[in-house]
């Protein structure tokens, strides 16, 4: 069921994108030879007028094939190149624009049912640097270190992608009683001492994984080892471990760890590693607030703005190397993500299940719109670059040269899709 729903959502987004191309091709007198959902061999099709409408085997894409779209011919009546340059620009741009329109409509539905998430300060820690700087409960954060904040999720994503370092100064703009206040402070630093391991579950003391460069790994412990004592005090389970640390917090002093491996006891003397973390000194809203009237449209638009900004920020992180290639997902990964969200949302009730599905559709549709507008050969954005140059020059770039560039881009895109799909499959299985 989850796979079917995921495929339907993904296919609907692709179909709406291609419908944008199709509609504006018709409006500009360009003949469409085939409008299809999916890739590969046809499963079913029918002919109406000049256009064949097809459903194909692989539900991983779609197409709107126009006469003369990939040729240098201009004389063919009804061909893509026979249309005016602004007509062709509208046809190419319509796909991504329709994705943004679809995302906006779905976002408005979500906001209408669920509401929006204001970046409201819920609680300021007493005696913290934030409290001393004047931050108050109920303040609405509108800017964080120069980054404009419309919604709480804006704040969350920005802080996730931009680690706060010790000594950094945080500058907030907040809305309070109808006026804007500016608050600057240097966050306090929390000091903890860590051993550097993850347990298989909260009740167990079996080491599931070790953190690179941390004390337990450097002492030679391995996944599967079970910690049985600390400084001679028996640790029977996770609860006993938590109780021990509550009474004897780790510090810079060495501790003696006893652990079991394959039925044999071993002992290691370990110095916990200091871990310093800047603390913002406040918590903020992650829930939703109901709204009505035109504000639904406003916050629907802000949801789309958030999705577009997040996509662009993620692309920036990929280019700068802060996100790895393994973070990319293709159609297989997208379908799996939708399916996983579907399964995890079942326990939240029918309304939230479908709101989460719509939210995934908003994210994917906005993401597809942004990605297609990238100025890369074979993508809509790459075609728009050539068309805009043609509009400025009053004459087209050599069609054969343009065709070769787009073909090379298409080949590179297909190779990337295969690699990303392989990566998706590895992550799933």
Regions found by a protein language model. Give the residues of each.
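Alpha-helical transmembrane signal-anchor/signal-peptide segments
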Residues: 28-29, 33, 114-132, 136
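Short, flexible surface segments
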Residues: 49, 60, 137-140, 166, ...
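PDZ/PDZ-like peptide-tail recognition elements
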Residues: 89-122, 157-161, 165-211, 217, ...
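Internal alpha-helical transmembrane segments
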Residues: 58-126, 408
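Conserved PDZ fold ligand-binding element
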Residues: 131-153, 216-240, 304
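Functional transmembrane alpha-helices
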Residues: 79-83, 194-218, 226, 233-234, ...
